A protein has these predicted regions:
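Ribokinase/PfkB-type carbohydrate-kinase core domain
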Residues: 1-30, 34, 40-214, 230-236, ...
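Flexible, glycine-rich loop/tail regions that form catalytic "lids" or insertion modules at the edges
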Residues: 224-225, 230
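Short basic (Lys/Arg) and small-residue
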Residues: 218
Length: 267
């Protein structure tokens, strides 16, 4: 891993790397074994998924400037294979692998090797990389580094010291513990984003957009929050506004998509 240029504030993306594989197919007949279509693959491509998609969005939102570091769990990446017919999802096949966790020592060494890191984005998909996330968050706090968690667990006690938790409606409703002073950034699809903090809810409506595919939009939100928060004067509210606009671009694209800096509309 290359060290960052010392003058640039940087982002660390840590978590579960996955691979999103897409197969464009045609379905012209049913199989004789069951009333199911036979899919003929016409073309295919892959994109980084999970924490990899967060990092890819960070890269593009920064305009291609390499001011971020990635830290993934060691081992094979889980693969999500999506089969599309006429731009519609016909089937999905997952191969899940459990990675070795990122240890506090490796995490600390990464931060100390890259002292310009100001924000850490934890992308937790439950594939093993962030088994020790509570201790990793505490390391961020000790070093005065902002950190945002995209959660997998439903019990959020281990996330209680994070700067914020970024979740969707389903994850929020499934949570079994939320700290009374925890900042929660909840995405609500085409209804925008809510900031829940100290018992108050602030709603940030999204701009009207044609929703084509919501795949990976949460990763775009997490990346955009991190990019904005590398500025010491950036508030959580300003970061949410920027993330909302970036997500509006992501959902207008088919499949996993990394939003470019020049695609994000002005406030």
């Amino acid at each position: 891993m290359d060290e960052l240029q010392p003058q640039r504030p940087a982002i660390l993306v840590a978590g579960d790397h996955m691979i999103d594989a897409y197969y464009r197919c045609e379905a012209s007949r049913l199989t004789p074994e069951a009333p199911l279509p036979v899919l003929k693959v016409l073309s295919s491509y892959t994109m980084p998924g999970g924490a990899g998609n967060v990092a890819n969005n960070v890269h593009h939102l920064l305009g291609g400037v390499e001011t971020f570091v990635t830290l993934y769990g060691e081992g094979s990446s889980s693969i999500k294979r999506r089969y599309l017919v006429d731009h519609h999802l016909a089937a999905r096949v997952d191969n899940d692998y459990i990675a070795k966790p990122i240890t506090p020592k490796v995490f600390t060494d990464t931060l100390e090797s890259n002292p310009t890191i100001r924000v850490v984005l934890f992308s937790d998909y439950g594939k093993g990389a962030l088994e020790e996330i509570e201790e990793l968050i505490n390391i961020c706090i000790d070093k005065n580094i902002r950190c945002i968690v995209d959660p997998y667990a439903t019990h959020w006690f281990e996330y209680r010291h994070a700067t914020a938790i970024k979740c969707n409606d389903r994850e929020y409703n499934a949570s079994t513990w939320i700290g009374p002073h925890q900042a929660v950034i909840k995405t609500k699809g085409d209804a925008g984003i809510e900031l829940i903090r100290n018992g108050e809810v602030t709603h940030y409506p999204t701009r009207p957009a044609q929703v084509v595919d919501v795949t990976g939009a949460g990763d775009t939100v997490l990346a955009a929050l991190g990019v904005c928060l590398t500025r010491l004067d950036c508030t959580v509210e300003e970061a949410i506004s920027y993330a909302n606009r970036a997500a509006g671009v992501a959902v207008s694209k088919l499949g996993t998509y990394a939003v470019r800096k020049d695609e994000v509309p002005d406030a």
